[in-house]
Amino acid sequence: MYRWKRCLLTGLMALVISCSTALMVNAQEQFVVLSGTELTRVVPPGFYFQGLTAPTQMRNSSAARFGANRYVIAGLVDTSGYAADVRAKYEGFLITDSAITINGTELGTGAYGFGFSNDGKLNILDLAGNQILSVSTTKDSAMKRPRPLMMTKVADGVRFYNGRDYALIAIK
């Protein structure tokens, strides 16, 4: 009888440990969209792109944290100092300190420029202005108050919005 209770107790402990470990791993991988002082702490005041530094529009910035200290940060910048051809493709910056996917396409760790095009694409550019990724966006016609840039948490990641158009960012 004693042996049976010991086996049962050991089995229950193993089950509790495995379930709690799974919950901890899941909690570490969840996105949290930052706001307030948490947001201002991680968003840079300016961003370098194609030979110039432009100030960040803090009201049009957003960031998400996943895990203990992994971030995806985005913001629109004042592009008035850039040439017209650069302004046509570059709206802001996207910084990620871990590999992510955007609509299922992998993007490595780094700092990038981005722009949403009129034909429903999100274009990711390296700091020299070369396009390295282009994905189709989805229109969210149910959104009541679109903003120029924002992130919202969903079950499988974060929606990265420009107005009503969005792309899904997920951890890799």
Predicted regions: what is each one?
Residues 78-127:
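Mid-length scaffold segments of soluble, non-membrane domains
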Residues 122-139:
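Short, solvent-exposed cationic patches
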Residues 3, 21-23:
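Intrinsically disordered, low-complexity serine/threonine-rich segments
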Residues 23-85, 134-172:
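Primarily secretory-pathway and cell-envelope proteins
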